[in-house]
């Protein structure tokens, strides 16, 4: 049982490394390919991979017809619109700024839950958002307090954050 814990921790660390590197890889890919093309290829590869896993391990789940609209809506937001916004955001900014803004998703989520679901915000939620927001501002301005990032790229990345939260 102890070995299983190590496998889970290793898998988590490996996933974080891949996630962090994906910003750099995406930026490199966008130098040669349009973000839409890259996203299409990424989703095709993921579809083939996960479909193979479904059949290989017999993980087929029957989806009720009434749930198809909700699945389609969810797929439209995540991954489709999220990747579109993130892709064009990374094409217009640096991977550092992109990863910093995308890292705000877990901090914006409680705020959206407060607005739409009337959930309570904890002091840690508020503190986390403030610290993260200040960190993003520090990344976006230079020592002369001038805005250095592309506003277009920032807007696309903010769109990715909002779509991921929605």
Q: For each of these PLM feature ranges, what is it?
A:
Residues 25, 85, 108-112:
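Hydrophobic side-chain positions within alpha-helical transmembrane segments
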Residues 1-37, 147-166:
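Glycine-/small-residue-enriched transmembrane alpha-helix faces in small-molecule transporters
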Residues 8, 32-81, 108-109, 162-166:
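Transmembrane alpha-helices of multi-pass small-molecule transport proteins
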Residues 34-46, 87-105, 150-162:
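Structural signature of hydrophobic alpha-helical transmembrane segments
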Residues 49-61, 105-130:
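C-terminal transmembrane-helix exit sites in multi-pass transporters
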Residues 18, 22-23, 51-98, 102, ...:
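Specific transmembrane alpha-helical segments of multi-pass solute transporters/efflux pumps
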Residues 50, 72, 121-142, 160-161:
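Hydrophobic transmembrane alpha-helices of multi-pass small-molecule transport proteins
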Residues 29, 38, 42, 89, ...:
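Hydrophobic/aromatic residues within transmembrane alpha-helices
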